[in-house]
Amino acid sequence: KEKVEEKAEAEPVKDEPVTRPTVAESVLHFDTEKGIAWPLEGELLLDYSMDQTIYFPTLEQYRCNPALVIEGAVNDKVFSAAKGKIMDITENEVTGCTVKQDLGDGYTAIYGQLKELNFKTGDTVEAGQVIGYVSEPTKYYSTEGSNLYFELQKDGKPVNPKDFLPELPMDTME
């Protein structure tokens, strides 16, 4: 027992600075003025609507929609809407292969109906980089056809992505 104590005293704690990543490397910032880019250019099949229900053709029912459902052909490239870190990659029966991306400041982008992802959980993706490709639609979107499910959240609650996207000439749902 004495030898252990002596050894502990013989090796004082070193007072060395701890190296940490710079703020720019570790903290993401979502610029609400700059907004986001369209992850896929295509017709809006289903618009964001959390205030009133909209008709979902495949389901043959009216529901609120926390996302944009953007038409795309199978194998179309899906681009990162903003710089962010891949938080999670999951598979579910509604949106298929789904990617959650932390954009910073409480904002999260969710991309669904994907395949052949180019990134893994923990990777940082720059705006405009290809995240993956449009997949065959799940059974929940079979009538709508192949598409990208694109949701934007602030602190875990859906917000309208169109409030942060530039207008497109093909945007027919305004």
Where are these regions (language model features)?
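Gly/Ser-enriched beta-turn/beta-hairpin loop segments
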Residues: D47-A73, N92-D105, Y140-E144, K157-P158
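Residue-level recognition of beta-strand microenvironments
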Residues: D47, I89-T90, L117, V134-P137
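Short, glycine/small-residue-enriched coil/turn segments at secondary-structure junctions
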Residues: D31-I36, E60-E91
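Conserved, short, structured surface segments that act as functional micro-motifs
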Residues: D123-E174
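Zn2+-dependent peptidoglycan hydrolase active-site motif and core
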Residues: S80-K115
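Polar/charged, compositionally biased leader and regulatory segments
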Residues: K1-F56, Q61-C64
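Generic structural motif
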Residues: L40-L44, G72-I86, G112, V125-G128
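Folded interaction domains in cell-surface recognition and envelope-stress signaling
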Residues: L44, A67-L68, D76, Y107-T108, ...
